[in-house]
Curated annotation (Swiss-Prot):
The lineage of its organism: Bacteria, Pseudomonadati, Pseudomonadota, Gammaproteobacteria, Enterobacterales. The keyword RNA-binding applies. It comes from the Bacteria. Involved in transcription antitermination. Required for transcription of ribosomal RNA (rRNA) genes. Binds specifically to the boxA antiterminator sequence of the ribosomal RNA (rrn) operons. One of its GO terms (biological process) is transcription antitermination. Keywords: RNA-binding, Transcription, Transcription antitermination, Transcription regulation. NCBIfam families: nusB (TIGR01951). The gene is nusB. This is Transcription antitermination protein NusB.
Length: 139
């Protein structure tokens, strides 16, 4: 699958996770509704589904990974920042096939696209501290 299709999968995952975090609907329903309503022509749909299910299933674990590196309470994070960080931490901790730098760079780009003005700096700061602990060999 092309890298662009993976990037689109991450973009769609941020949007769907944002919706899930706010609605707290079943993740399968959020996925179904998202795929029915959005143009997913250039999206790696399998990867999108894996990100959604992986983040939803591992939310407490992923939140635990980020908490030591947050400069504010988890509850005070914006929903976009939370979704972006959860995706990146899922990739870093559960997807060893995704290179360390790719997971971080993609998260920064997602934060620039969907987040508030400086959220990419915040996301970069958290991941810069968390990633070496999650992947000590930086691969």
């Amino acid at each position: 699958m092309k890298p662009a299709a993976r990037r689109r999968a991450r973009e769609c995952a941020v949007q769907a996770l944002y919706s899930w975090q706010l609605s707290r609907n079943d993740i399968a329903d959020v996925e179904y509704q998202f795929l029915a309503e959005q143009d997913v022509k250039d999206v790696d749909v399998l990867y999108f589904r894996e990100l959604l299910a992986g983040v939803a299933t591992n939310t407490a674990y992923l939140d635990g990974l980020m908490k030591p590196y947050l400069s504010r309470l988890l509850e005070e994070l914006g929903q976009v920042e939370k979704a972006v960080l959860r995706i990146a931490l899922f990739e870093l901790s559960k997807r060893s096939d995704v290179p360390y730098k790719v997971a971080i760079n993609e998260a920064i780009e997602l934060a620039k696209t969907f987040g508030a003005e400086d959220s990419h700096k915040f996301v970069n700061g958290v991941l810069d501290k968390a990633a070496p602990v999650i992947r000590p060999n930086k691969k």
